[in-house]
Each structure stands twice: as structure tokens, then as C-alpha cells.
């Protein structure tokens, strides 16, 4: 499983090649902290909603700290998605490295 740091994601976005940011956290977590433009599909809904994800698209999966998103990234790879990364450190790392306005929780 590949990982991408928040800084690498930001660099790709700045270069005009932003991957899809897939937020797999629960609704209550989004109420605390969210990243604009992220697509939200809760972890438990991923199998039923695979059709919403393009297999050819670059997808970066995020959760709070990187554990759940790593599981989803592995699952997507098993389903044939080859352009998938786990966001290293999750939204906590995003807050620390890119956007301190996002509260850690």
C-alpha cells in the first residue's frame, strides 16, 4: 500500500493534478473537522458505494490518523483500484502540516 503525505498531496494539487480525497470518517467526525473538497463515504459504506469511485482516478484515502484509511486503501487495491494512497497521519497530520484551522480531536 502506498502512502502520500499531506505535503505531497498539496504539491500535486498546486500542480493542477489533485487526487480525489476520500474521507472515510463518520458523520460525527466531520462535524468536528473536515477538509473542503473531500468526498465523504463512511468506511462501512465503501463496499456498497464502490461504483462512486473511478478505478482509473488517483484516490487518497483519509481518516483521523491513518489506520482506518490504510484498511480502506488495501480493500480498494484488492478490488482492482491501482491508483490508491493512504494519507499518512490522516487529518491530524493535515492539520499539523497544512491547515492549523482544522482542530485535532
Language model segments and positions:
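Short, surface-exposed ligand- or partner-binding patches at beta-edge/loop junctions that are enriched
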Residues: 62
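Rhodanese-like catalytic fold shared by cysteine-dependent sulfurtransferases
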Residues: 1-20, 27-58, 67-105
Amino acid at each position: 500500500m502506498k502512502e502520500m503525505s499531506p505535503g505531497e498531496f498539496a504539491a500535486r494539487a498546486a500542480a493542477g493534478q489533485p487526487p480525489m480525497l476520500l474521507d472515510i470518517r463518520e458523520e460525527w467526525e466531520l462535524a468536528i473537522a473536515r477538509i473542503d473538497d473531500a468526498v465523504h463515504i463512511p468506511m462501512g459504506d465503501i463496499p456498497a458505494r464502490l461504483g462512486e469511485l473511478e478505478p482509473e482516478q488517483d484516490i487518497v484515502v483519509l481518516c483521523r490518523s491513518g489506520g482506518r484509511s490504510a484498511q480502506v486503501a488495501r480493500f480498494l487495491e484488492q478490488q482492482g483500484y491501482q491508483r490508491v494512497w493512504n494519507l499518512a497521519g490522516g487529518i491530524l497530520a493535515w492539520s499539523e502540516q497544512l491547515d492549523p484551522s482544522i482542530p485535532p480531536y
